[in-house]
Amino acid sequence: MRPSLQLETIEARLANQTVTTQEIVPGQREAAVALVLQPEVSGLRALFILRAKKEGDPWSGQMALPGGHRETIDADLVETARRETHEEIGLDLNQAGRYLGSLAGIRANPRAGFDLVVTPQVFALEDKAVPLQPNEEVAE
């Protein structure tokens, strides 16, 4: 199966799904991560990062999708995922990516114990020659 057909299938399924949203209660934080898919001849690749080790970071040293907390400047969680991805690895999803849809949010259970709902946002990377520039939060 060609990767473009796989992306089309993923996009169609995301468009046709009913996303169950987590109820956000007062004091609870929201975050978004970007699941970035890149078509290759052999199939799809997904972009992961290795978070830098940092004292006090509940996700320190873990493999992750780029993303982070929703800020007041973010219109929605798609914008959060785009902003955080650009900040963390220099990838501008507004230019190099195509938004495919959202997955259901999940409650995170960080070691720090605070309440957080993380919602994955799915993108297709359409430009294969995009250089990544990790910031200090990313080991690789």
Task: Give the residues covered by each predicted segment.
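N-terminal strand-loop-strand
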Residues: 22-65
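Surface-exposed, interaction-prone regions with an acidic/low-complexity signature
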Residues: 2-7, 44, 48, 59, ...
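Acidic/proline-rich low-complexity IDRs
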Residues: 4-6, 13, 34, 43, ...
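Short N-terminal helix-initiation segments at or just after the protein's N-terminus
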Residues: 10-13, 60-69, 85
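Charged, low-complexity, helix/coiled-coil-prone segments
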Residues: 17-35, 123-139
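Entry/capping segment at the start of metal-dependent catalytic domains
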Residues: 1-25
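Unchanged
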Residues: 55, 69-140
